[in-house]
Amino acid sequence: MEDVDLGFLSQEKLDEKDYLDIECSRVGGAPLFIRKNDAAFLNESLENSFEFLMQLYAPKNSEISYHRILYIFINRDGDSQTAGWTRGVKVFREQARETDEIDFQLITSKVTKLIDSSEIEVDAEPKEENKKEIPEKLKNVKVDTENPSAEPYTKAKGDVSFLKFQKRLSRAPDQIMRYYHATSNEFPGLWCNNECIPSSIPNCACGAKRQLEFQILPTLISSMNIDHSAKNALDWGILSIYVCSASCDLANCGLAEELCWLQTFSEQGIIAPE
C-alpha cells in the first residue's frame, strides 16, 4: 500500500530564529545550509531570476544522510516553467553525517518575496472516507460540454486522470505537497494529466536510479505573492521531485543537483458525461 505524508502550511509565520532550525521544513524565508561553502557556491552560481521556494528536512536511515535537506528554487518568470524536465525549477540535496562538524550558513540575500515564510506541517494522508470539499482552484478548470462525443478516447484519458487527481485531493484540500516513503518508483505518485508523465528517469551522477520523493501541488500557488492574472504568472499542475535513491555522498561534499518534472493540466478540460 502506498505510504504518503501530506504537507500543510502552518498559520504561524516564521522569524530568523526559526530559519536557524535545521529540522524546520518550510516555504519562504531564507535557506539554511549545512556548510558555508555550499551556501557561497549557490549564492554565486544561481541566476538572480531564481527565488527560494522551500526546503525540506528529510533524513534517511544511513550514516551519510543523518542530516539531509532538499532545497527548491524556482524561476519567477512563468514562461520558464516548461513541461517535462523543467529548467525553471532547481533542486539541490545537501547531507551530513552525525559526526560531521556543522557550519550552518543562512543566505539572507536569498530571502524571498515570492511567498511568506511558513513551516510545513506534516500529517498522514486521510483515508478516502474522510474526503472534503474540492479546492476552488481545481473546481474552476474548464468543462467542455459542447461536443462530448468528439475524440472520446484521447480526451477521456486526460479527464479520468484529472478526476482521480481531484478525488485524491478532496481527502485533504489544503495539502500543498505529498511525500512518498516508497523505496522505488513502484508507486508512481499523483498525476493530473495522463499525457505528461515521465517514461524515462535519468540516473544520479553516482549511477544510482532516481526515484520520486515528493510532489508540490498547485494549491501552493494561491499562497504566493504574485500577480495571478499576469500572462507569465507562475503556474503548474504538479512539480514532481526526483532524487537519488541511494542518497549518495555527492551531497556530503557539496550540493548534489536533482531533477524536477513539471506536469501541466490538460488543455482539453473535463468532458461532461452523456
Swiss-Prot record:
> Where on the tree of life does the source sit, at the highest rank?
Eukaryota
Q: Name one GO cellular component term.
A: cytosol
Record InterPro entries = PDCD2_C
- One Pfam family name is PDCD2_C
Query: Could you mention a single GO BP entry for this protein?
Result: maturation of SSU-rRNA
Q: Which family does it belong to?
A: To mammalian protein PDCD2.
Tell me what this protein is called: Uncharacterized protein C13G6.09
